[in-house]
Structures are given as C-alpha cells and as structure tokens.
Amino acid sequence: MSAVQIFNTVHVNGSSPYDVHIGSGLNELIVQRAAESGAEQVAILHQPSMDDIASELDAALVAAGLKVLHLNVPDAENGKSLEVAGQCWDELGGAAFGRRDIVIGLGGGAATDLAGFVAAAWMRGVRVIQVPTTLLAMVDAAVGGKTGINTAAGKNLVGAFHEPDAVFIDTDRLATLPDAEIIAGSAEIIKTGFIADPEILRLYETDPAACLKKEVEGSHLPELIWRSVTVKGSVVGQDLKESSLREILNYGHTFAHAVELRENFRWRHGNAVAVGMMFIANLSHKLGLIDAPLLERHRSILAAIGLPTSYEGGAFDELYDGMTRDKKNRDGNIRFVALTAVGEVTRIEGPSKQDLQSAYEAISH
C-alpha cells in the first residue's frame, strides 16, 4: 500500500453523521475502519473491472483478521437490478452475514448505489462503507445516502435512504480512469458550482485543462472534489430525504433522467446531466428567470471541457414522456430545479408543453 495522505475531510451532519475522507493511499484507513468496527465479515461488492483493487483490499482485510466475501456484480447500470440485488442477498445469507458486519461498495456509481441498497435492505440495514473509484461516484453517488436500483419504469425508482458509515475518496484512482470518465464526472461538479459555489465555475473558466488533469500534482481535481462534496454534504446533512433543500442537487436532472431512459441507460450520467443543465438553462431564459449571459455561461463552461451541450432532434415526445415520470413531480406537474442567478435556486412547476418543446428545440441538433 502507498503511504496514507489525507487532503481534506468533509463531515456530513444528520441523524447518522459520517466523514468523507479525500486523499491518497487510503486502503490502510479502510481496513482500520472495518477492523475497529466490531465486524466479523466484510462483503466487498464490486464489478469485474475492480477485481485487482478488490483483491488488494481483500488481502489487507484478511491480514487484519476479518473474513471477506466478494459480491461480484455486472459492470455499469446492468448491475443495478432486482435480480442482481437478490443474488447478493442470497450470498449474504449463505455466509451468515450479520447485523454487525459491513458491506463495502467498491467502484463507480452503479456499484455504490447497489451496495448501499443491498446493505439498506439486508436485516433492515447493515453498515456500508463507500469506496468510489470514478469521479462521478466520488462527487455524487457515494455521498448522501441515496441508494437504488433501476426498473423498466425508470432509473432509481426503487431504493432507500441509507447513510454510509464512511466514504473514502482515493485520488490515486483518478489516474486509472479514461478521459471520458473524468469529463462526464465533471458535470456533477459543475452543477454544484451553479447551485452553490461560484469558485468551482471560476476554476473551470480560468484553467479547464487543470480541472481535467488526472495526476494530482498541478491538478484542480482534488480541490474541485472537496468543494463539490462540501456542497453536497452541507445539503444532505440538512435534508437527507429530499423533503425540500436536497432537491437543489437535482439541477439538470429532470431532462437528464429522461435522456437516460430513452437511451436505455447507455449514456454516461454526467453527459446526460450536462445536456439537462442546458435544457433547464434555456427553459429558465425563456421564462425570464436568467439572462442571456448566464445561459451562455452554461454552454461555454460545459463545452470547454468536452461535455455535450445539445441532444438529438426529433425525440421530444419520448423525452416528455420520460419527464412526466420524474420522482420530483407533484400533482401531475413536471417540476424543475432552476436558477435565478449563480447560487440562487428556485423551482419551475408545471411549465407548458409548448415551453418545454421550445427549450428542447433550442438544444437539438
């Protein structure tokens, strides 16, 4: 294991407070946390692409006196199904996995979502440690306690709120990621900039290359991760179950989820969020909530790092149907998180279908 180095720790308040540790060489801390927890067994839920990292963690956990079970799941969103969750529960049952034992979610957002859901449901809730390895999972899926699986009706419609015991964000993993993963994950960071932290936007505008640099030296990514997690941690610490404030984290997500549903989840989530932010920015501009410079600021920041700013034309009816299924809707009205300025958030409730189509056409290609 490489030497442990902690860059930042974000404390998330709430009914079950926890810490998000951001640094490098964090396996030692993960093992220490599990060994001191009173657990007898640890179940590492991971995808095939994480086999090597899981084996390294396995050896360290065994050396610390813990029994280790591997929950091997399919890559990407294919693993977020009731069938796969059921297989995990069967394996936990076969291992006599108890209330004091711990699940570790190792991998991207799909793995951490599934690990959290499996842990939330097993014996009505066992502990989960999240170890995100993609940028998207680091700043979004692994933090906040939302867990879930997908169904034919939509993404994450079946799930639970289950806060992690701890989150370990190891920036050494960034160097192993394809450029496309760094770019896609950046969309969620940019989202937190628009809703709460203008410094994030300034960093992307002044040096976009440093915001994508995977090697830590000279990179803005560690600071961006810390800033984004700080925003999310502050929000979910006040509103775990999305009764009010937490909804602001869904900026750009109503249209994004419709895109993902239409694309059968083949689109990267971050790419869909980028297009979703362009959609809501255009709708907000049309309704007089934001000015033209803020609309253009969305486009320029996203485009500067290679995120999509438009979507396929001729798909409005399918996308509209997807938006009507969104979890945030109330009384049959489609609801959007919107801006009036950077850091100033409002809601749009029940916009006309004509206005929605106009916003869609503005980003169609």
UniProtKB/Swiss-Prot annotation:
Under which main EC class is this enzyme filed? Answer: lyase
In terms of Pfam families, this protein maps to: DHQ_synthase, DHQS_C
Native source species: Corynebacterium glutamicum (strain ATCC 13032 / DSM 20300 / JCM 1318 / BCRC 11384 / CCUG 27702 / LMG 3730 / NBRC 12168 / NCIMB 10025 / NRRL B-2784 / 534)
What pathway does this protein act in?
Answer: Metabolic intermediate biosynthesis; chorismate biosynthesis; chorismate from D-erythrose 4-phosphate and phosphoenolpyruvate: step 2/7
Cofactor, how bound (note): Binds 1 divalent metal cation per subunit. Can use either Co(2+) or Zn(2+).
GO cellular component: a single term: cytoplasm
What is one Gene Ontology biological process annotated in the Swiss-Prot or TrEMBL record? amino acid biosynthetic process
User: What GO molecular functions are on record for this protein?
Assistant: 3-dehydroquinate synthase activity; metal ion binding; nucleotide binding
- Reactions the enzyme catalyzes: 7-phospho-2-dehydro-3-deoxy-D-arabino-heptonate = 3-dehydroquinate + phosphate
What does the UniProt record say this protein does? Catalyzes the conversion of 3-deoxy-D-arabino-heptulosonate 7-phosphate (DAHP) to dehydroquinate (DHQ).
What is this protein called in UniProt? Answer: 3-dehydroquinate synthase
Please name the HAMAP family in this protein's record.
Answer: DHQ_synthase
> Would the keyword Amino-acid biosynthesis be found if you checked this record's keyword annotation?
yes
Which CDD domains does this chain map to?
A: DHQS
The residues the record assigns to binding Zn(2+) are 188, 253, 269
Indicate which residues the UniProt annotation says bind NAD(+).
75-80, 109-113, 133-134, 146, 155
